[in-house]
Regions:
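Residue register of alpha-helical TPR repeats
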Residues: 34, 76, 225-227, 266, ...
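An often Trp-containing, charged/polar helix-loop segment at the C-terminal end
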Residues: 921-991
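Catalytic cores of nucleophile-dependent amide-cleaving enzymes
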Residues: 758-766, 827-927
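Amphipathic alpha-helical protein-protein interaction segments
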Residues: 401-409, 413-416, 441-746, 773-782, ...
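A domain-level signal for caspase-like cysteine endopeptidase catalytic cores
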Residues: 682-689, 694, 710, 730-732, ...
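Boundary/activation segment at the start of structured domains
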Residues: 652-653, 729-790, 963, 972-991
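Single-residue signature of alpha-solenoid repeat helices
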Residues: 52, 94, 205, 245, ...
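Amphipathic alpha-helical segments of tetratricopeptide repeats
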Residues: 58-64, 100-104, 109-110, 210-217, ...
């Protein structure tokens, strides 16, 4: 047991004794706050926040009361209890304590005027020689304000007034720790400014606090004047007060512009945060250094720890690696004094060591921090999150990618919070609170829109530099309802369609970003390094050039990877590892090693405190969309959040925006349609001849679904369309649009009869519907037990398909294979078709698209990674989303595989909402691959489906229709909806 642990345990024992002792045996009744408060504060100082919270609750229970009301001596324990919740990540509960404390101050506005202040020279603080690890920026003395001041009031005789205040007779003398009351009030005001952000100005407390602090105390003591300036300044940061808040805080850092005092550290911390937000890192660093030094002298360890964390962030963001040594000295000094300070210094020094590429030192420092945080008594989730983030950065810098991903996930887990604590990230908390206040009419629509727009905005350069982990947690958190509400507010305001399209696109892109561990940062770096420098925005080009100058191996590695890919593509397909040349194997091993190292380096860059715009996928622009559309094209896009659905239809010369009114009926209609065509069997399934009859039940349901989804204006736009480019969202990815009726009138033909249909992931990726036809030199088919139950028939069907495709190679999973590596096979193939079941759940990145050889290389999520070379044409008729089991999820099991393919180089893909299999799939797939040789993908799928309708199949050969009822006909026509309406053509090229 360390000395620090022994000290903390002794404090906890003392706290317990005080809690059970008689009031007469505790601190004298006139001394406030009670002794329990100071014991709890010591526990907080050493990082035992959970035990400290218990202590502050005990102090609250023993605090003075006036009738049923608390007095001002409850302010410190309330605020410090809030600090315990804040450190645990429970922003909501922390805010409750801060507000309760400030309400007490508002309820007792005259208490500060009852303080008996002696106008005398303040004693200088005895210098602590060992607190010299940083240079103080100003040559001022440091003075001690008496902690306990007399109040000419007896709170035991006080009575509440009708107005809610407190009236106390001047009889006895009470000793109150005024400096602690004021110091903790400054903490509460700062936290409200940070936690509430733009909401602070709309708080019911904002105006009363402004009024209270606008009235200066009657006392004229210089230290009290300085303290009041700090409180008023910090309060004004989160209000509409017409004052220079920063100047007030700056003036309050010194007593009469001469001496530092107990509130100087807190004021300097606030000034540093303001400068950091402005990007003035040199000034911020000076303020944080001074705050840490002074806080250490006053033994305000929480301020020391927070100042060091902020200092380290600014140092890393601005390249101040010279602060590495002082941070190490601070860590040594803090040993046996404060776990929170020591951990903050170690983590900050560790990150600076990583930027200096001294990974050995960084590893040593972070291991020391980990030992400190592993103690059972220490509970610092924010520090644990910071440690995991910094350890992840170290692992990526050392090319230990698996460890990096593990620690990153741990860091995000801490930062996202839990169902118990709620959101840890302020912007997420502000978003949810804004939605709640708007729903309860406590916030105007205009104010809510402004706040949501700020909270949901693309992270700024300053955000990435100061709080990269919090930004990543924010970007990887589902926020669909907030984006939908922002869209609704913009619609109510009468925003132009271009703005609405951009908001819809952001919601669609967010669905991709939230599923990626780095929130799209890796995609941004891959895009930046793979593209031409001239294609980047000037600010992004500057960042990339600086990174390449700092890490020149990046450019060389990228060029070498490209060379190796070209070399392997020119060689034979790696079908049999035993027949590969030594040179080919050597080239692939080098590529594999270099790619893994390159990905680690990209992750290292992505986690660093440097901004790079997330331009992949591109942001949407209505003029750009309309400019690309061909005559006869209609774009239809949706966004969905909860029970709210919005759609937009776009033609070259026309747009229409609408809200889907009856979403509950929409869900019921979709579920009914899937049941009526026989995909989901609840009770007796329809007979095949019933499902293909003109009066089949599903036809009426499809008409109802179409009428729910599309207003008359959109039906009119569709009537003259030749191709529909669909961009669904959420569970609308499961809708088989191809089988919806052509017109709003009953009995009309399905969409697929009248027009081609294609899909792209987001509005901003519309160019994926206008690609160029790729040159196909190698086609590869991978076939499992998919076309027939008996292997000979299945293999024969696969061979027929392969023979109809030029330059085709066939791999049968029923045979023993010696494929070297799925990744190698993927990069060497131009056209890939996989006739095998491919399970795709909510974690769709794990869908095993290449079920060969090394299992870890089979997942489609790896298609994003280096070497990012994917087959130009992909067919996955066996993709198996959760819809097959009757589960209507969030659509990620379709959306994410599409993103993986199209954003990694694939030009088009044919996938399925449900796997059909059997002989009908053999006929469809063969026709689809043949049509692709001469036609665009959307037209190829349409022609293949219509050709399928003319066929007759043995019911026994169609597993999706089995088991069948005894009265079923042995033959089933190819126009049975289950056999064709699940296929989707994703991505397209110009006509």
């Amino acid at each position: 047991m360390t000395a620090l642990q022994t000290h903390a345990r002794a404090l906890y024992v003392v706290l317990g004794c005080l809690a059970w002792s008689s009031p007469l045996l505790a601190q004298p009744v006139s001394d406030l706050p009670r002794a329990e408060y100071y014991v709890a504060r010591e526990l907080f100082r050493v990082g035992r926040t959970l035990e400290a919270a218990d202590g502050f609750r005990t102090a609250l229970n023993r605090a003075r009361r006036v009738g049923e009301q608390r007095w001002v001596d409850s302010i410190p324990p309330l605020i410090m209890l809030g600090e315990c919740h804040y450190q645990q990540g429970n922003l909501s509960l922390a805010l409750e304590q801060y507000d309760a404390a400030l309400l007490l101050a508002l309820s007792n506005p005259g208490w500060i005027d009852q303080v008996e202040v002696q106008v005398e020279q303040l004693a200088e603080l005895e210098s602590t020689k060992k607190v010299n690890w940083l240079s103080k920026s100003r040559q001022t003395k440091t003075v001690v304000v008496p902690a306990g001041l007399q109040l000419s009031v007896d709170p035991t005789q006080a009575q509440p007034t009708p107005q809610g205040g407190v009236l106390a007779p001047v009889s006895l003398v009470t000793q109150l720790d005024v400096t602690e009351v004021l110091r903790t009030m400054s903490i509460a005001l700062m936290r409200r400014w940070e936690v509430l952000g733009p909401l602070a100005k709309h708080s019911p407390l904002a105006a009363p606090l402004d009024a209270m602090f606008a009235r200066n105390p009657m006392q004229v003591a210089p230290w009290l004047t300085a303290s009041w300036k700090v409180l008023r300044g910090v309060s004004s940061l989160g209000s509409n007060a017409q004052v220079d808040a920063r100047q007030l805080v700056r003036e309050g850092t010194l007593i009469a512009n001469q001496a530092d005092y107990y509130l100087s550290p807190q004021a300097l911390l606030v000034l540093g945060k303001l400068d950091a937000r402005d990007g003035n890192y040199p000034a911020a660093i000076v303020s944080f250094q001074d705050a840490a030094l002074l806080a250490a002298q006053f033994e305000q360890m929480a301020v020391v720890a927070e100042s060091l964390s902020e200092l380290s962030a600014c140092a890393a963001a601005s390249g101040r690696l010279d602060l590495l040594d002082p941070l190490q000295r601070i860590a040594t000094w803090a040993n046996k004094k404060s776990s929170s300070v020591q951990v903050a210094a170690l983590i900050g020094a560790g990150e600076l060591a990583e930027y200096a590429e001294d990974f050995v030192l960084a590893d040593k420092l972070l291991r020391q921090a980990a030992v400190m945080l592993r103690g059972r008594e220490v509970s610092l989730p924010r520090a644990q999150a910071s440690l995991a983030y910094t350890t992840s950065l170290l692992a990526f810098g050392q090319n230990r990618r698996a460890l990096g991903l593990t620690n990153l996930e741990l860091a995000l887990k801490f930062t996202r919070g839990t169902a118990t604590t709620g959101a840890v990230v302020e912007s997420i908390f502000q978003t949810q609170l804004t939605l709640n206040l708007l729903a309860s009419n406590a916030l105007t629509a205009a104010a809510a829109e402004t706040i949501l727009a700020e909270a949901l905005a693309e992270p700024s350069e300053r955000d990435w530099q100061l709080s990269p982990l919090e930004v990543l947690a924010e970007l990887t958190t589902a926020r669909d309802p907030a984006f939908i509400r922002l869209l609704e507010l913009a619609i109510s305001r009468g925003a132009m369609v271009d703005e609405l399209v951009q908001l819809m696109d952001r919601a669609q892109r967010q669905r991709l970003y939230e599923s990626l561990p780095l929130g799209g940062r890796l995609m941004a770096w891959r895009h930046a390094l793979a593209g031409q420098p001239g294609q980047l925005l000037p600010e992004d080009r500057k960042v990339v050039e600086a990174a390449l100058q700092r890490y020149p191996a990046l450019l060389a590695s990228g060029q070498r990877i490209e060379s190796l890919v070209n070399q392997l593509r020119q060689g034979p397909l790696p079908l049999d590892e035993r027949k590969l040349s030594a040179d080919a194997k050597k080239a692939y091993l080098e590529l594999e090693e270099l790619s893994a190292s390159f990905e680690s380096q990209l992750a290292f860059l992505s986690l660093q405190r440097r901004h790079l715009g997330r331009v992949s996928p591109a942001a949407a622009s209505l003029p750009n969309i309309q400019q690309q559309l061909e005559d006869g094209d209609v774009v239809i896009a949706f966004v969905m959040g909860g029970q709210q659905v919005y759609g937009v239809a776009i033609r070259r010369d026309q747009t229409h925006m609408w809200q889907v009114a009856e979403t509950a009926k929409l869900d019921a209609a979709l579920a009914g349609l899937l049941a009526e065509i026989g995909l989901v069997r609840a009770g007796k399934a329809a007979l095949p001849d019933e499902a293909t009859a003109p009066t089949a039940a599903w036809r009426a349901t499809a008409e109802k679904l179409a009428s729910l989804l599309f207003p008359a204006e959109v039906h009119t736009m569709l009537n003259t369309s030749q191709r529909v480019i669909l961009i669904p969202h959420d569970r609308l990815w499961y809708v088989p649009y191809e089988m919806l009726p052509h017109t709003a009138q009953g009995g009309s033909a399905a969409w697929i009869v009248q027009r081609a249909v294609t899909y792209v992931p987001t509005l901003g990726s519309i160019e994926l519907a206008f690609g160029t036809r790729p040159a196909i030199q190698r086609s590869l088919g991978i076939v499992g037990s998919f076309f027939a139950l008996d292997p000979p028939s299945n293999d024969a069907a696969a061979s027929v398909i392969a023979q109809s495709v030029p330059n085709s190679t066939l791999l049968l999973l029923s045979q023993k294979l010696s494929v070297a590596a799925p990744t190698w096979l993927k990069l060497a193939t131009d056209q890939l078709w996989v006739a095998a079941p491919i399970a795709s759940g909510e974690n769709a990145w794990d869908a095993a698209v290449l079920p060969l050889g090394k299992p870890h290389q089979a997942h489609i999520g790896l298609w994003f990674e280096t070497p990012r070379t994917s087959p130009a044409i992909v067919a996955l008729p066996g993709l198996t989303p959760t819809l097959k089991q009757g589960q209507i999820g969030r659509g990620n099991d379709i959306f994410l595989p599409i993103c993986a393919m199209l954003f990694s180089g694939t030009k088009t893909a044919c996938i399925s909402r449900w796997p059909v299999g059997g002989y009908s799939t053999k006929i469809f797939l063969q026709r689809e691959l043949e049509e692709l040789q001469t036609d665009r993908p959307s037209a190829a799928l349409r022609r293949s489906v219509l050709a399928l309708w003319t066929e007759q199949f043995l019911l026994a050969d169609e597993p999706i229709l089995l088991p069948a009822a005894k009265e079923s006909s042995p033959l089933v026509p190819g126009n049975h909806p289950l056999l064709w309406s699940g296929y989707m053509s994703v991505g397209d090229w110009k006509n």
